[in-house]
Amino acid sequence: DDELNVGPYDEKSTWGCIKKHGDHYMFELAEPPKGERAPVVSFRSTKAELKSIHFHAPSEHQVEKHEFCAEFHLVHEICSQGAPGDKYGQEPSSKIVIGVFANAVDDKDALQSLSLEFCTSLSTVKNSEEDCCVSAPFSFNELLKDAYSKLQRFYHYRGSLTTGTHDEVVSWFVLKEQISISSSMQDKIKLLDQPTRELQAMNRRIVLSKD
């Protein structure tokens, strides 16, 4: 019952547009073609549709004071819930965000192609003198390779957005299993200077751990 499930994350690339929101840059998914559906995450009786992706470097979450070189955020909007009386009740949040830690390694098999295309498009938007958006594909095959096993080990809590007005509207799922990115990709990410919110106090939040 406490499994986190996604689909169709392991299919073909998803197209979208990279835009600037305040000081941050993110990938917003385009409407899927007729007959296809956007990636969806489900937890208990709640389902949420993927809307945007962005990252922070270094990571915004820490594990036992350990900071990771980057953290991807997959932002989902809740689209359906269990009916009143459902044994799990209504999810009080309006978003589900999956956090994926990344560390740099000197390995030719480390994540490169996905982040390279993503970073190149981000740089184009960042260096533009006017507001603009750049169309780009985003493949989940590498980011969530072996997705099912990765998604079954996570930290879960209810908290806030880490950008904008920091509204308390998020059910967070931070995956315990990190991904590897190439050292050269880490350098490209740092050059983008994507803001990272400073570490926040727990403020009575309860963090659940699932293995």
For each feature predicted by the language model, list its residue ranges.
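Alpha-carbonic anhydrase
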Residues: D1-D211
